[in-house]
Amino acid sequence: PHPYSSAASDVYKRQMKARVDTAVAQRYGRTDLILTYDNDQFFLNRPLLLDAGLDLDEVARFVAGVAETAPEVQRVLTAEELRPGAFFEGAEANVLRGWSAKMSGDVVVMLKPGFLEYGRTGTSHGSPYAYDTHVPFLIMGPGVPEGLTGMARTEIRDIAPTLSALIGFPRPSGCTGRPIEDLFYE
């Protein structure tokens, strides 16, 4: 199959899980330390790690090191790296914005640009790269300066606060973006 087809994606996902499962079994003598690999994330079996006296972050670093050897992988981030929130720009910052300490995996795999891990039912919410996160933004109407072009890059997360500011509504709860300033100054 074509390297970016859904069939290839299914193969990649199985191969990635098998690669890491094998290495974890060899290192730790157990095959049950990883619950699942889904949506480019490894979810570790936290209760089992605790019972076995294994350090979650150390096992996550080991899993990341193994996953990083796959040819499709650009970078691998552990929860330990993501928890401090140290990424402010680029693809890593996009990963961080979508990551939750309570809900996300313990190891996040960033695939190389152009590659998505998804099955036959469709694609994902996108990669963390600019070609997948850039949305052309066109706006017109009362309160919008006429003929304004060439604004700075617009982030998806800036659209809701911009529209809220234009119509005089409070920003939505949990909103992380900012109104697009060019629209409010002539």
Can you annotate each of these PLM segments?
Residues 156-158, 165-179:
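Extracellular ligand-binding/catalytic regions of CAZymes and related secreted enzymes
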Residues 179-186:
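C-terminal helix-and-tail extensions that cap enzymatic domains
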